Amino acid sequence: MRTIKEWNKIIENYFNENNIEYDRNYLCFFPENNFIKVFFDKNLIYDFNKDLRESIIVLFKKDNIEIFSCDVTLKISSGIQLSNIGKIRKIVPREKVKVLKLVKKIMRYKLYFKLDNESKAFRIDIFFRFNKNWVVKNINYLIENRLIDFKK
């Protein structure tokens, strides 16, 4: 397992092993959490790993987007770890996507995704972006190549 700084190597190894074409057109997102939910959780210690289980890797392409499940776990000794990419893989044609927008917030980026009547929000937190050049480069690549709508 590697740290967030090296997640791109793990993701790209998975893509190469499975003959999936990619460039810098992918990002990893955490599920959207509500701070109030975390703060007022009934348990004495909030289980962040429970919420991180719904993390995804999104591969943005001109004709479709591919969504890959992944396991993200928080370990005190080694930080946030990424593993088991692609247990679930879904390919969604672009014409079925109603909204696909990346919005820059104060402390994070949020991805808004709507497919017909189903909508989801995911996030890339500020701590996830700092010193993770691959994340910033990939966001810039997606914007420059118009693979995602971007709003500041």
Write out the residue ranges for each language-model feature.
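Generic ordered-secondary-structure signal
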Residues: 2-10, 18, 65, 72-74, ...
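Anionic N-terminal interaction surfaces
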Residues: 1-62, 68
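Short, surface-exposed beta-strand/loop "edge" segments at domain boundaries and coil↔beta transitions
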Residues: 35-38, 64-68, 74-76, 118-124
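Acidic, Ser/Thr- and proline-rich intrinsically disordered linker/docking segments
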Residues: 82-152
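Phosphoinositide-binding peripheral membrane targeting modules
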Residues: 43-108
